[in-house]
From Swiss-Prot:
Binding-site positions, shikimate: S20, L21, S22, T67, N92, D107, Y222
Family the UniProt entry places it in: Belongs to the shikimate dehydrogenase family.
Residue positions of the active site: K71
Source organism (scientific name): Maricaulis maris (strain MCS10) (Caulobacter maris)
PANTHER family registered for this protein in UniProt: BIFUNCTIONAL 3-DEHYDROQUINATE DEHYDRATASE_SHIKIMATE DEHYDROGENASE, CHLOROPLASTIC, SHIKIMATE DEHYDROGENASE
GO CC annotation terms, alphabetical: cytosol
Record function comment: Involved in the biosynthesis of the chorismate, which leads to the biosynthesis of aromatic amino acids. Catalyzes the reversible NADPH linked reduction of 3-dehydroshikimate (DHSA) to yield shikimate (SA).
UniProt pathway annotation: Metabolic intermediate biosynthesis; chorismate biosynthesis; chorismate from D-erythrose 4-phosphate and phosphoenolpyruvate: step 4/7
GO molecular function: NADP binding; shikimate 3-dehydrogenase (NADP+) activity
Source organism superkingdom: Bacteria
Quaternary structure, from the entry: Homodimer.
Protein name per UniProt: Shikimate dehydrogenase (NADP(+))
């Protein structure tokens, strides 16, 4: 239905945000639910984040999903926060209530939702995470909750990697960026939580010959779906998972938080997104 002047309004913010498929996901669910609602992208720069978010809250917006580079700032802005958001130190969901702004992190559930079909033996896994920002924080926390004990962090800024380890996983290994290929040896769960590979940016180049076929590789990027990380890991015989399913998985609880009802069951959502991207 076409939104009216009484529509519930929510959205997504980041910088950049034009690439986001969150409005597409939400539009499909809004239409399937038949509710009067609008979900829009809001490009907000870091310097304007607090002011604009507070303005949207004051204008009656129901809330925002939050992506790079604002996830840590979102948590700091909120008056209250869920336990997982506090533990991770980052939020990808802000809801605006009469009591104030509330922060949550649905990336944790979204990440595990995406990994589920791969049947990873988490307690035996040797994981390697590239990145140390808000997404990496959520993914590292998620791995710990399902029993992963052997994990290493590799980031271009080693100080941020050390901070991530200190905050969430003190026993995690810290790998200098220049040693990233050596770090692949013996790892069977490799995760790209950086922005490398996002359309218009540099790719994450790795020596996949060092990875055992049958391992699992996850890329949080979904535009493009077939990043260099995905294409080259798949060519090695690795189970490669792109970011689309994490997008869908993290969006479900967001929809309910914004609009007060569960997201409709659309088993073909991934196919709809691929069709939208022209990636079939």
């Amino acid at each position: 239905m076409i939104p009216t002047g009484a529509a519930f309004v929510a959205g997504v913010t980041g910088d950049p945000i034009a690439h986001s498929l969150s409005p597409v996901v939400m539009r499909h669910w809004i239409d399937a639910a038949g509710i009067d609602a609008l979900y829009a992208p809001f490009p907000i720069s870091a310097g304007n984040f607090d002011r604009v978010v507070r303005g949207l809250a004051g204008a009656g917006c129901r809330g925002l999903n939050v992506t790079l580079p604002h996830k840590e700032a979102a948590l700091e802005l909120a008056r209250t926060a869920s336990g997982p958001a506090r533990a991770v130190g980052a939020a990808n969901l802000l809801t605006f209530t009469p009591a104030g702004i509330h922060a949550d992190n649905t990336d944790i559930a979204g990440f595990l939702y995406a990994l589920a079909p791969a049947n990873v033996e988490f307690r035996k896994a040797r994981a390697l995470i590239f990145g140390a920002g808000g997404a990496a924080r959520a993914m590292l926390y998620a791995l710990l909750t399902v029993g992963v004990t052997d994990v290493a962090i590799c980031n271009r800024n080693i100080t941020r990697a050390q901070g991530l380890s200190r905050d969430i996983a003190p026993d995690a290994g810290i790998i200098p960026w220049e040693a990233r290929d050596d770090a692949l040896q013996g790892r069977d769960l490799i995760i790209n939580a950086t922005s490398l590979g996002l359309a218009g940016r540099d790719e994450l180049a790795l020596d996949w010959q060092r990875v055992r076929p049958g391992s699992v590789a996850f890329d949080g990027i979904y535009i493009p779906v077939n990043t260099r990380f995905i294409v080259e890991s798949r060519a090695r015989g690795v189970t490669a998972i792109d970011g689309l399913d994490m997008l869908i998985g993290q969006a479900r609880p967001s929809f309910e938080a914004f609009f007060g009802r569960p997201a409709p069951d659309l088993p073909d959502m991934r196919s709809r997104l691929l069709e939208h991207l022209g990636a079939r």
